[in-house]
């Protein structure tokens, strides 16, 4: 099918999905999870083809993003079941107003309609996005990167089998066969056919959507995430958090990319950092972190001299930009200049410094004494997320079910007319 045909088919799925009750949607998600596991062999074979084709062209870290395993497939099915267990967002009354004239006005959550997701080489996004869209009563159109197409196609075939078993339209979940820039542009300009576009990818993709999209678009920005170690930090805690934020999974958007350290503790902290992230990892046979150091940090430990652009780089790799700052205000200013407004953390025992940091850092998630790696729908108790929004309107931070709905006002009356016989009951007359 062409992109236009897929878009038209998705429009036809809007009404059945909008009318589906929670039990129907939950049964569909369970059937999709069962079908996903049943198709494990086919999905893993397809994934191996993707890995074979990508090997030598992308880094080992990016290959890890692309790779599927039986354990990861089990986690994907578990994620779908977790979405099924969440309350149905559709039909929730967000606000109720009873007017003096007897009108009952309810601000009610309703499905978005058709949600398009452009993403790159993370096949697990396929099942996450489909589960969230179905539970939120919307059809979803998926456009993955070419490196992951075989994997995503096999996953979507399984999900559509689950939809058929649950008697919901299989076109509620569709994958574009075209992975070119042209297909992405087609989604960006599909006015009247796409109700919401969510790009999940690198800076180039996000910029293209912001500049070219004529349909509503939510930015799920790149993650230049910062950790600031304050002079009042517990330095052992700080090393633990920095290690986790950088090395637990460096290829994801909530991984730390820049470390800022207060000048008063730099001489004590940097040797601890190097021992843990560089020497200790090398001794354990793990990839050491390449430290890109500003001049003050380089005077204390060895590393790579930091270039100015390093502090604006999302490495998605075992690399970390490091700078020394004078105080918490200097850290806040550095973050304001270089942040992508995703996730930032302060490590401190000083409540005043923590309050200043959380009030002044303008990012979707701001942590005190915790790793930025918690910026995730599941970790927030929202279920799997469609992405992490770095903008301020409609959605900000991990986008769960509530953020995938819009709302309408439903008004119940008993014959009221404006300026008519009931006007004397109203608190407003023209």
PLM feature segments, named:
Residues 85, 93-236:
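Rossmann-like NAD(P) dinucleotide-binding subdomain of oxidoreductase/dehydrogenase enzymes
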Residues 328, 333-429:
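C-terminal core of ALDH-fold dehydrogenases
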Residues 1-105, 132:
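N-terminal Rossmann-like NAD(P)+-binding subdomain of aldehyde/semialdehyde dehydrogenases
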Residues 120-139, 158, 162-165, 205-317, ...:
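ALDH superfamily catalytic-core signature
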Residues 22-26, 90, 166-173, 248-255, ...:
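Flexible, glycine/charged-enriched surface loops at secondary-structure junctions
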Residues 13-19, 259-261, 317-326, 341-346:
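Short, well-ordered beta-strand elements within core beta-sheets of diverse protein domains
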